[in-house]
Every structure is written in C-alpha cells, then in structure tokens.
Amino acid sequence: MSIKSDKWIRRMAEQHGMIEPFEPGQIRENDGRKIISYGTSSYGYDIRCAPEFKVFTNIHSTVVDPKHFDEKSFVDFHGDSCIIPPNSFALARTVEYFRIPRNVLTICLGKSTYARCGIIVNVTPFEPEWEGYVTLEFSNTTPLPARIYAGEGCAQVLFFESDEVCEVSYRDRGGKYQGQVGVTLPKA
C-alpha cells in the first residue's frame, strides 16, 4: 500500500470524478485576504468546510448515546463561520463530494492551523467505494469559544492505494453512510 501523489490525485479527480469540485492547486488567498489553505498538496488534498453546521447543545440535558441519538442535541446554523462553545463540538460537511476507488483507502487528518488553536478535526477513513459529502466533527478543547470558517481548508485527505483490490467494499456491504448529502448524524 502506498501513499498517492499530487499527480495521481489530480488525474483521478479530473478523469474519474474522485473529488468534485476539485482544486488542482493550493489556494491560500480569496479576494486578496489570507485564508486557511485548501486544494491539492504534495501527497494529499486539503478539504473545505461548507457553510452548514450543527452545533452541540446541552439545553435538553440528555445522555449522548450513539445507538439512540437525539437530534435535539444540535442547533442548526448556516454562515461563513461558526462559533463552537467552550469544551463542545460542531458537525459540518465538506464542500467536496468524494467517490473513492475500490482499491483506495483514505485517512483524513486535521490541519495544524486549527490544532494549534485547540480545535481538533475528526474524520474517519473513507473506505473503498464510499461516496458522498464528508461529515466533519470539530472539537473545541479550549475553555473559550472557538471559530471555524466555511469555504476554507479544515483537514487533509491522504490517499493510499492497495496492492490488491478488496473482496468486499463499503458499497458492497451497503454502508449506512453511503451517498450522504448533508451533515449526517450517527446511525446505529
């Protein structure tokens, strides 16, 4: 299994629709102002956060249970940025839609710009033949409110190509998050 380069990522996105919309370079500015970078890097792709968020709230004082998740635990928010309360988290989704090839697995890591501010981005791997918008989780580990930005980089996806094709892909086993289009809550 080997990590894939910018050249491979560009080819797969442009010829096979692996990432849509796709940015072949690294974008660091928008209208003359600095932003958190996104687009193709040497051995990965920096994804962007869309302007739709679900911010965790404890208003209903319920137990957080992944098997019986209460949708009232979140407040929906749309905007260019989102404030995450202290020691809380928010869900978002990517701007980009992904179609992962059958012989590829991705690992997604948070960007250091956010990590250095105490904001941790958590995303699970994108499995072979998974497709959809990625649901992102932003944890604010600080005792202060923290801001995240829509339309800017938030995490980096690394692509690994296997030496052999898997017997059963995410699509084959009917994965529960296949084809997700919005911020998707836990499914048991």
From Swiss-Prot:
Pathway(s) it belongs to: Pyrimidine metabolism; dUMP biosynthesis; dUMP from dCTP (dUTP route): step 1/2
Any one GO MF annotation of this record: nucleotide binding
Keyword 4Fe-4S attached: no
UniProt keyword annotation of Nuclease present: no
Active site per the UniProt annotation: 137
Binding residues for dCTP: 111-116, 135-137, 156, 170, 180
Residue stretches in coiled coil: none
Top-rank EC class of the record's enzyme: hydrolase
InterPro entries: dCTP_deaminase, dUTPase-like_sf, dUTPase_trimeric
Gene3D superfamilies: 2.70.40.10
Signal peptide span: none
EC number: 3.5.4.13
Pfam families linked to this entry: DCD (PF22769)
Catalytic activity: dCTP + H2O + H(+) = dUTP + NH4(+)
Alphabetically ordered keywords of this record: Hydrolase, Nucleotide metabolism, Nucleotide-binding
GO terms of biological process kind: dUMP biosynthetic process; dUTP biosynthetic process; nucleobase-containing small molecule interconversion
HAMAP family assigned to the protein according to its UniProt record, in alphabetical order: dCTP_deaminase
Function per UniProt: Catalyzes the deamination of dCTP to dUTP.
Summary of subunit composition and partner proteins: Homotrimer.
Homology family: Belongs to the dCTP deaminase family.
Protein name, as recorded: dCTP deaminase
